[in-house]
């Protein structure tokens, strides 16, 4: 068969434009989703933080199921909490469990993020404080840091914090992230024999 060179070139150009258009649409959709996430986070923060602790709404009233699914997937490899040696000895070890019994809660981050935070700190304890949403100096006189990993979360009711928890400090923000940008959630209190405890070589 006889082919028209100009027609072939035109077809190739149209195919290229179609591919570029498809990529742009994917890029635009991704950017829009990110902008929406940022917009909603800004929407959450201001009004919710004005509500006194103890009266803040359940996160399920302002976070959709898609967001929750994506957020909880971060914890597929387990959850981790970092405490001072003092807090571990006087509370967790003394009680035989980690968490706050008053409201049956424990703030945690994904284990994979704990690995990153510790590595990126380069031994700087202030960096860990900042990333985990603690005031500067919070860990300074605690005698070192203890890492507690929880692998099996199946019976621990993984959920977003509302900001009403006993452990929610003045730097808490809505949406499941620390003020330092690390994903967080809460579990029920965890027996120490269901955890793995190790020391972090930072003081």
Task: Report each predicted region and the residues it spans.
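Catalytic toxin/effector domains delivered as secreted proteins or via bacterial secretion systems
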Residues: 3-20, 38-203
């Amino acid at each position: 068969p006889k082919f028209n060179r100009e027609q072939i070139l035109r077809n190739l150009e149209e195919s290229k434009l179609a591919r570029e258009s498809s990529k742009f649409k994917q890029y635009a959709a991704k950017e829009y989703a990110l902008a929406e996430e940022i917009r909603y986070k800004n929407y959450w923060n201001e009004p919710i933080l004005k509500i006194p602790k103890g009266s803040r709404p359940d996160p399920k009233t302002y976070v959709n199921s898609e967001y929750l699914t994506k957020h909880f997937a971060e914890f597929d490899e387990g959850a981790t909490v970092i405490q001072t040696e003092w807090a571990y000895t006087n509370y967790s070890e003394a009680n035989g469990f980690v968490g706050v019994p008053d409201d049956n809660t424990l703030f945690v981050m994904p284990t994979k993020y704990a690995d990153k935070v510790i590595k990126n700190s380069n031994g700087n304890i202030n960096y860990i404080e900042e990333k985990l949403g603690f005031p500067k100096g919070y860990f300074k006189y605690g005698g070192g840091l203890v890492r507690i990993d929880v692998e099996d979360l199946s019976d621990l009711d993984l959920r977003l914090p509302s900001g009403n928890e006993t452990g929610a400090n003045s730097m808490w923000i809505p949406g499941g992230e620390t003020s330092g940008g690390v994903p967080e959630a809460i579990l029920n209190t965890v027996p120490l024999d269901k955890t793995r405890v190790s020391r972090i070589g930072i003081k």
